[in-house]
Regions:
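Bacterial Sec-dependent N-terminal signal peptides
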Residues: 1-39
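Short, low-complexity N-terminal intrinsically disordered segments enriched in polar/charged residues
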Residues: 28-57, 61
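Hydrophobic pocket/interface hotspot
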Residues: 51, 62-64, 71, 88, ...
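A solvent-exposed, acidic/Ser-Thr-rich amphipathic alpha-helical stretch
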Residues: 60-115, 119-121
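Short beta-strand segments enriched in hydrophobic/aromatic residues
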Residues: 67, 75, 123, 127-131, ...
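Exposed beta-sheet edge and beta->alpha loop/turn motif
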Residues: 125-155
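Low-complexity, intrinsically disordered terminal/linker segments enriched in charged
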Residues: 157-177
Length: 177
């Protein structure tokens, strides 16, 4: 009788060990790769890249068709409020008038999601800006994050800039005294 109980106990131990090992092996499998299924992402990504390319070449007129007339821009300055089309165009012109050798080097481009985590065709990017101030000659460099939302026509209808815009301007205007 004792031998039978030991065999039953060993079978239970073996089955439990087998279940634990199986669960471990299953849990170690790689998660499926997330693929952007939003058909607008590639087109919107090309628009965002073109927007930066035109900013780097200081071609505001060529940028304008990429921007929705109802755009909302969230600038990177302390205490700033969202601006609409005219403020956005003026801000871009201000950067271009006050800086030369403007470059944005994107480190990564990513698809964006809505508030529920669903891929929505929006575009995000992390990168580094550098430029030379025309008044002081100071060269500035700053890491940045930008997010773009697009309308049905593929134009930028919301742009959010995240970087230290106020500190950047202070560095650009600093004197060497």
């Amino acid at each position: 009788m004792l031998i039978i109980l030991k065999k039953i106990k060993m079978k239970k131990s073996f089955l439990i060990s087998l279940c634990v090992c199986s669960l471990f092996i299953i849990s170690c499998q790689q998660a499926p790769k997330v693929v952007d299924t939003n058909p607008n992402y590639e087109k919107n990504l090309a628009t965002a890249k073109k927007f930066f390319e035109l900013f780097n070449s200081e071609d505001l007129d060529a940028q304008i068709p990429l921007i929705c007339p109802g755009v909302t821009h969230y600038p990177p300055f302390y205490g700033s409020e969202p601006g609409k089309y005219d403020e956005f165009i003026a801000a871009g012109k201000g950067w271009m008038d006050n800086f030369d050798e403007i470059t944005y080097n994107a480190e990564v481009w990513l698809p964006g999601t809505d508030s529920l985590g669903v891929l929505n065709g929006s575009v995000r990017t992390y990168g580094n800006w550098s430029a030379k101030n025309t008044a002081s000659g100071n060269v500035i460099s700053n890491r940045a994050y930008h997010s773009f939302e697009f309308n049905g026509a593929g134009q930028i209808h919301e742009l959010r800039d995240y970087f230290d815009g106020s500190g950047l301007m202070a560095a650009a205007m600093a004197t060497n005294e």
